[in-house]
Structure formats: C-alpha cells, structure tokens
C-alpha cells in the first residue's frame, strides 16, 4: 500500500470511528463507505439493504470467486475521551475495532481496483456482527454467488505491528447468550411474606455458574454474567420478576451444551424452592 492510500485509509478509519453506530443501525456508516468506494474505485456496488458488497470481476478465465468480509457495527459503550476522532454518537463506540476492519477493506478495494486480481472478489461490508443477525444474512451470498473461499481477520493486541497471525483449527470460541427469567409475586416491602422474590434464586444461580466455571469446567468453558435485572430503586416494593444474562463460551459446542444444562437444572431447582416460575431464552448464538 503506497503512502497516499495508507494515509487515506487511516482518515477513513477515524471517520468511521467518529460516526459509530450499533448493530442494525449502520445507516451513516454504510452510506459513507458506499460513497467512498464509488468515488475511489471502479468496482461494482450492490446495495443489499442493511449491508452491501463491492465486486471486482477478473479477466482470468480460471478465476475463482472469493469473498473478503469486514463488519461495520459499533458497541453500545461510551468512547474513550481525549482522542480527536471520538465518537459523536452518545453511548456508542468502535471499541471492538470494526472501524479498522472496514477501513482496511476499503483500502483493499482501492488496490484491487487499481492493480487487478486473478480471482473475482466480493468485498462484503457486513452489518450486525455483534448480534449475529448480519452474519446469517450475509452468509447467503456464499451460495448465491458460488463463493469458493471466504476471508476475514480480527485485530489482536500483543503482537508486533504489521504481523499477520494464522492458526490451524479453531481461532474463536463458540458463544451463546443464556437468559434466565424468573417470575414470582411482587409485594409491599413491609410484607415480603406475601410475595415471592426472585432475587435470591437468581443470586444462587449466578454463584453456581461462577462455581462451574472455576471448578468443573475450569479452562474448558466460560460463564460470564453480563446482566442482572431484578427490581429497582423503589424501596417500598419487593420485585416479582427478575432475570440474569450469562454468556457461555467454549471451543467445543458440546461443552457449552453441558454447562448450559448444568446451569438451567440448578436454576429450576432454585426457582422451585422459592415458589417461582422459570423460563430460559437463547440469544446471540454463534456456533
């Protein structure tokens, strides 16, 4: 990459960082990237609604169809203060580096457009990576266009700048969101005996999940509590509903199934002891 394109790519990354948008709302991000690629390359651009791809057609009669993918969405987190390109979107930032992914793919679009390639290339700008929705939708392009190879990368700290790291086998864990919903009966705070408070059963379940992670599944699985919701700052009322959200991770899906079974079985028992109803939901399932 020449110096001029490198400097432009860095500016693109900064602008993407500044206009960060959450999953499913990557409107400005998508428009910005489509406009840039239309101005700076000769690639064909196909708008697919929530996402888009740019296409380079090779003159090689033996060309394969390959895909190179980047994700566009930011995270619902406040940005780091003190940088000149800080996100202008309240509560949203590119703390996972997707601004860099898109900027790099933009730079690659420019290079392939100028220098050509021996294969047909689909440059895929994916929405909704953090929620999983975008990956499922964009994956349909693989069969639709008979794509033979798909490539992507992720920035990773701790390695020397400019290093490309490859690994045989699994690189990222499978992941699954487990939502535990408990329903009891609300009551006035002065008469807790009239109600059924889910707080205690949820607390026991959360502690059990941590115990499983640290003992039975140590090194094989993670059970990270990412959310707890039970009542609020209403000191005259005891809650009748509550939930806990736990992210399960492992390199083996069978291990995720096992730890999920252990947690849900414990939650059922804890809920029964407190006179509660309990249900479970899965979200953000990544095989």
Where are these regions (language model features)?
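Active-site beta-loop-alpha junctions enriched in small/polar residues
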Residues: 21, 71-73, 128, 156, ...
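Acidic/His- and Gly-rich active-site-bordering loop/insert found
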Residues: 1-94, 103, 111-119
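Metal-dependent amide/peptide-bond hydrolase catalytic core
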Residues: 203-287
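Histidine/acidic-residue-rich, glycine-tolerant segments that coordinate divalent metal ions
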Residues: 75, 83-93, 99-100, 115-228, ...
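Structural signature of FAD isoalloxazine-binding scaffolds in flavoprotein oxidoreductases
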Residues: 69, 104, 152, 241
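Short, small-residue-enriched loops and turns at beta-alpha junctions
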Residues: 19-24, 75, 131, 232-235, ...
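N-terminal hydrophobic/helix-forming segments and targeting peptides
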Residues: 1-20, 31, 35-38, 110, ...
């Amino acid at each position: 990459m020449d110096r001029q394109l490198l400097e432009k790519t860095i500016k693109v990354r900064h602008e993407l960082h500044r206009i960060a948008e959450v999953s499913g709302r990557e409107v400005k991000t998508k428009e910005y990237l489509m406009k840039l690629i239309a101005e700076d390359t000769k690639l064909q651009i196909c708008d697919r609604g929530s996402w888009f791809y740019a296409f380079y057609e090779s003159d090689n009669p033996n060309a394969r169809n390959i895909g190179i993918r980047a994700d566009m969405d930011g995270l619902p987190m406040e940005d780091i203060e003190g940088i000149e390109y800080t996100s202008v979107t309240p509560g949203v930032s590119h703390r996972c580096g997707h601004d860099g992914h898109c900027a790099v793919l933009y730079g690659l679009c420019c290079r392939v457009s100028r220098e050509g390639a021996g294969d047909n290339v689909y440059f895929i700008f994916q929405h909704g990576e953090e929620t999983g929705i975008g990956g499922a939708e964009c994956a349909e392009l693989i069969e639709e266009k008979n794509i033979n190879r798909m490539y992507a990368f992720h920035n990773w700290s701790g390695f020397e700048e400019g290093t490309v790291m490859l690994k045989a086998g699994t690189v990222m864990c499978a992941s699954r969101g487990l939502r535990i919903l408990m329903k009891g009966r609300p009551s006035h705070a002065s008469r807790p005996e009239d109600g059924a408070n889910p707080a205690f059963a949820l607390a026991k379940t959360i502690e059990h999940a941590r115990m499983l992670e640290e003992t039975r599944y140590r090194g094989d699985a993670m059970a990270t509590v990412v959310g707890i919701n039970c009542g609020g700052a209403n000191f005259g009322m005891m809650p009748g509903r509550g939930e806990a959200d736990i992210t399960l991770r492992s390199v083996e899906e069978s291990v995720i199934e096992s730890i999920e079974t252990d947690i849900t079985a414990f939650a059922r028992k804890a809920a029964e002891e407190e006179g509660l109803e309990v249900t479970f939901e899965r979200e953000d399932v990544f095989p």
